[in-house]
Amino acid sequence: MKTQAMEKINLVQAFTTFSDYWSPRVAGDINTSQIKLAKFKGAFDWHHHEHEDELFLVVSGTLRMHFRERDIDIEAGEFIIVPHGVEHCPEALGDECHVVLLEPNTTLNTGNVTNDRTVHALSRI
């Protein structure tokens, strides 16, 4: 059984440890899910996740989640859950957006799409 030390993580400090965009970092594990930190800039790619729901918690900036039928803006301190199978395209409004993701550890950042933004091996904070 995998155990993890009980340590607090300062989100503001953790976001200063990396600078690349759209490349999530694992900050912690909860059973079969992971807490990931990511910096978003501009728009990502349209995609969906066949089996995984995703939670996007905005720490700073504004995230616009595009869906085929509408857009939803998520401000700092707000979150949105995107159910599996729902096509979506995240976009950071303004300069950049810092986001905490809570999702199953099987979740590929680009979902059903494989391209140069796909991250197969995630780094840890």
Role assignments for model-derived ranges:
Residues G42-D45, R70, G85-E87:
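Short beta-turn/strand-loop junction motif enriched in small, turn-promoting residues
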Residues H47-H48, E91:
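Short glycine/serine/proline-enriched coil/turn segments at secondary-structure junctions
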Residues N31, V59-S60, E75-A76:
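A cytosolic small-molecule/anion-sensing beta-strand core signal
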Residues V26, L55, R64, D71, ...:
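Short, surface-exposed charged micro-motifs
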Residues R68-H84:
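Short acidic-glycine-tyrosine-enriched beta hairpin
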Residues K39-F40, H49-F67:
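Short, conserved beta-strand element in jelly-roll/cupin
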Residues T3-F15, G28, C89, L93-I125:
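Double-stranded beta-helix
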Residues L11-W46, E52, P104, G111:
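A short glycine-rich, His/Asp/Glu-containing loop-to-beta-strand
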